[in-house]
Amino acid sequence: MIKTDICDLLQIEYPIFQGGMAWLGTAELASAVSEAGGLGIIGAGHMPPDIFRNEIHKVKERTNKPFGCNIMLMSPFVKEVMQVVVEERVPVITTGAGNPGVYIPALKEIGTKVIPVVASVLLAKRLLRGGIDAIIAEGTESGGHVGDITTMALLPQVVDAVDVPVIAAGGIADGRGVAAAFALGAHAVQMGTRFVLSEECIAHENYKNAVLKAKDRSTVMTGLTTGHPVRIIENQLAHKYKNLEFSGGSKEELENLGAGTLRKAAIEGDVKEGSVMIGQIAGMLHDVKPCKEIITDIMTEAETVIKNLQTFGK
């Protein structure tokens, strides 16, 4: 069995994180991943604090294993949500869209592990000074909000730049990807798109079918001119957004067009006018399975790949 420093740090069986996806990173999915030995993560997104607290309670009812919460630091509820994290003594948080430094002292006091997501070496170095426990290097292959550096290029540079464990994210969905991430210095991997296609994910059937039908070139980047690019499946919404974006649309117009579109796709099932946030790896996914099977299959394959690689030098 593959064990890494991350497994010891977080007391998890397998070095696999489930991405904290807004609307889809629910208690049902997070608890299933944690029960299967990985780190399940509630995607707080823009959840009001009372709903967020309820999701935490539901996870605790379903599993006694470690879990995490992904906190978007630009959320209008971030202060209240962080207070809930402290009050509920959440074991792990991952963070995005900002610097968690101001919250770290209170989190350290209760033993919460803080793991920010970064898309550049510069940001990794900056956040390291705040006392983080590990860091997620997320490549542009990921779905949703992303940077512009690939995982293959970003990961080893972040590994070389920091002295905490690094988790690889972006473009990973099977044991081959896990083995490759380890070869580049990662101590764990984070996967979002693969867990969208799990039985426990609440994504609408249309959303899952859109992922299943996706090919290698099915996703596009929107918001490139705004400084906040988002990877989604190319559909009517993507075309409207890019047309508005590159014809001089204002920031307000773009925000209005994008507002509520993730829920429209993920929960309501409108995959034409909604935002289907998935990664480029979707083209190699062809089935929906329980989280436990996903994790055990991936780790078994990773062990086989690593073993087979050892024969190359003989």
Role assignments for model-derived ranges:
Residues 1-161, 165:
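Active-site entrance/lid segments in N-terminal catalytic domains of soluble metabolic enzymes
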Residues 22-23, 38-49, 136-148, 172-207:
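Glycine-rich phosphate-binding active-site loops on the catalytic face of alpha/beta enzymes
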